[in-house]
Amino acid sequence: MNINTDIFKIQSNNVMPSRGKILISEPFLHDVTFGRSVVLLVDHTEEGSMGLIINKPLPLMLNDIIKEFKYIEDIPLHKGGPIGTDTLFYLHTLHEIPGTLPINNGLYLNGDFDAIKKYILQGNPIKGKIRFFLGYSGWECEQLIQEIKENTWIISKEENTYLMNEDIKGMWKEALGKLGSKYETWSRFPQVPSLN
């Protein structure tokens, strides 16, 4: 019996990492932090790369750490990565916030936190507008390129507009589905095949 194992090989789409690109982990990556993750690259230079894992919620709310938010609706926190886990990052669509770093497609990183707090405390919408993270993901010079060559990641050339969607549990599958039918097969592969 011949089994076609090519369905699990990444076919390079010749997309190079850059700010605003999306990294999608391959299905066999058995890593607590990066397994089945979708990472938004917020910076990529010769010195290294920085990203935020978009689809890993934390069992903690922003309201638990920002006292001014104690009496408003819960604001979820996400695990941005294993580095600087005591540092808050925020991805948003609010171009008017001073000091933001434009990512692309209307997404911005950080900016004046007092302006963000004011926006929230005025009762403005948070869902689909702002996502908060503790920590970030980082790669040293050439480390990410090497991991891509080793087929740990595929870089999506799709727009990152779905990254602010609320359904983060299905985001890895959604990101794979945007890559075409070959990768859609990956999305149906069980996380722990031996338990199937």
From Swiss-Prot:
Entry's family note: Belongs to the UPF0301 (AlgH) family.
Any Pfam family: DUF179
UniProt feature coiled coil, ranges: none
Organism from which the protein derives: Bacteroides fragilis (strain ATCC 25285 / DSM 2151 / CCUG 4856 / JCM 11019 / LMG 10263 / NCTC 9343 / Onslow / VPI 2553 / EN-2)
GO cellular component, one term: cytosol
Matches recorded under HAMAP family: UPF0301
Name by which UniProt lists this protein: UPF0301 protein BF2109
Classification via InterPro entries: AlgH-like
Gene3D superfamilies: VC0467-like
